[in-house]
């Protein structure tokens, strides 16, 4: 008899606990998926400092070739603007110098530039500064695009943007973002294959905000090799897409 009463009490207690959990569970809101929130998510804000000023004060000295490219092409004012709206894609030194996928190797067949002085490399007769200039303009959008949903509303869908490039074959860039809001450049089946084959690059670092919020910069990831972010060599005759 005692055993029966004990079991009955245990069963009653378990039923009560289950009932309480069921009702409390109704009040629980579903866990929210990852959502980009510019007020919370990591961003790097530099006040009135411009992109040009920041590049020259970078403590790791990673942008020697980027700085020299801007100087050689006379684009300092663009990178130094406090009032115009731009999105810049920046490249660290290995993106310029890696043999094979690096800029000098792909555009000019210029190898082994990593240990050379940037000024000396840009003054090499093999380097066409018009091509360098258009490449920097290609990596510049005349609007503000961060990794949030304002321009990139749907996951894994490439959105098309017009760059500032004057090269007839290299004026369009596509940008997509994955579930974690990592931006991917030119990974779109709609882009022509081009004479460099399928080339795309992930963004390694996002949302460096300059010029009182008028400009934003993103830095290409190295991804073992610095891949270029478009598929046609610069300076060639117009291609029929």
UniProtKB/Swiss-Prot annotation:
Please report which positions carry a covalently bound lipid of kind N-palmitoyl cysteine: 26
| Superkingdom, taxonomy of origin | Bacteria
Per the entry, what induces it? By ulvan and rhamnose.
Q: What is its main location?
A: membrane
Report how it sits in the membrane: Lipid-anchor
Q: Where in the cell is it found?
A: Cell outer membrane
Q: Which GO terms describe its cellular component?
A: cell outer membrane
Residues of the signal sequence?
1-25
Query: Lipidation sites of kind S-diacylglycerol cysteine?
Result: 26
Q: Keywords for this entry? A: Cell outer membrane, Lipoprotein, Membrane, Palmitate, Signal
What's the stated role of this polypeptide? May be involved in ulvan degradation. Ulvan is the main polysaccharide component of the Ulvales (green seaweed) cell wall. It is composed of disaccharide building blocks comprising 3-sulfated rhamnose (Rha3S) linked to D-glucuronic acid (GlcA), L-iduronic acid (IduA), or D-xylose (Xyl).
Name of this chain's protein: Uncharacterized protein P37
Question: What is the organism field in this record?
Answer: Formosa agariphila (strain DSM 15362 / KCTC 12365 / LMG 23005 / KMM 3901 / M-2Alg 35-1)
């Amino acid at each position: 008899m005692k055993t029966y009463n004990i079991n009955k009490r245990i069963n009653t207690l378990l039923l009560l606990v289950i009932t309480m959990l069921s009702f409390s569970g109704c009040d629980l809101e579903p866990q929210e998926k990852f959502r980009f929130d510019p007020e919370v998510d990591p961003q790097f804000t530099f006040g009135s400092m411009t992109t040009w000023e920041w590049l020259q004060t970078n403590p790791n000295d990673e942008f020697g070739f980027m700085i020299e490219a801007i100087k050689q092409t006379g684009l300092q004012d663009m990178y130094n603007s406090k009032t115009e709206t731009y999105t810049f894609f920046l490249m660290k030194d290995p993106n310029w110098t890696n043999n094979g996928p690096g800029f000098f190797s792909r555009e000019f067949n210029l190898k082994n530039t990593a240990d050379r002085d940037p000024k000396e490399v840009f003054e090499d007769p093999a380097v066409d500064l018009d091509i360098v200039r258009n490449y920097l303009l290609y990596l510049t959008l005349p609007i503000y695009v961060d990794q949030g949903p304002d321009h990139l509303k749907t996951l894994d869908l490439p959105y098309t943007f017009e760059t500032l490039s004057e090269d007839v074959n290299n004026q369009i860039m596509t940008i997509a973002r994955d579930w974690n809001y990592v931006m991917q450049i030119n990974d779109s089946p709609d882009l022509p294959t081009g004479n460099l084959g399928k080339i795309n690059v992930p963004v390694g670092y996002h949302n460096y905000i300059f010029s009182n919020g008028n400009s934003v910069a993103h830095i290409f990831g190295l991804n073992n090799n610095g891949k270029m972010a478009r598929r046609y060599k610069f300076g060639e005759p117009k291609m029929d897409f």
